């Protein structure tokens, strides 16, 4: 996914999918960014592109951002707030300001969360704040899936210590 940074000048070659999400972000960080962060972390990971819009043909294109660095700083402040999101999975290099065409965009690389951190959820309630990625959309996780993630987190190896049955 990171090698995509080298090709962001060809942004129109990309489409939103289960690993790429475009956000205009011209009015600041959109609330839906956090749903996508949760969804990517709980699924396969992906990249969120701030300052990018989707055309009628579904191709992506950059739009001017007032202050990309301010957006990145605001993101860092919020991703470290447990009232916003349950865990920060990112390293400094996972948030980059890159040039695409004549505009700068903010690329946020969200890794898939390790089972010990899942579910990654918004707010304080995993049952209402956990999302997963389906195609190009973020969907709220059903209760039974959240329960399964919590169970896996508590007991990552439920078969440890068991002996094979004798024949």
Regions found by a protein language model. Give the residues of each.
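Conserved N-terminal catalytic/coupling substructures associated with nucleotide/phosphate chemistry
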Residues: 1-167
């Amino acid at each position: 996914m990171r090698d995509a940074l080298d090709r962001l000048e060809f942004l129109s070659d990309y489409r939103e999918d289960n690993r790429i999400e475009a956000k205009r972000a011209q009015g600041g960080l959109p609330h839906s960014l956090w749903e996508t962060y949760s969804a990517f972390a709980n699924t396969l990971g992906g990249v969120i592109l701030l300052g990018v819009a989707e055309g009628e043909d579904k191709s992506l294109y950059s739009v001017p951002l007032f202050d990309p660095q301010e957006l990145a700083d605001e993101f860092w402040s919020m991703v470290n707030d447990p009232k916003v999101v349950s865990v920060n999975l990112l390293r400094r290099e996972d948030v980059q300001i890159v040039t695409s065409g004549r505009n700068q965009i903010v690329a946020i690389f969200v890794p898939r969360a390790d089972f010990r951190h899942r579910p990654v959820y918004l707010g304080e309630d995993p049952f209402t704040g956990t999302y997963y990625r389906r195609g190009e959309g973020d969907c709220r996780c059903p209760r039974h899936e959240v329960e399964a993630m919590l169970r896996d987190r508590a007991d990552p190896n439920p078969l440890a210590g068991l002996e094979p049955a004798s024949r």
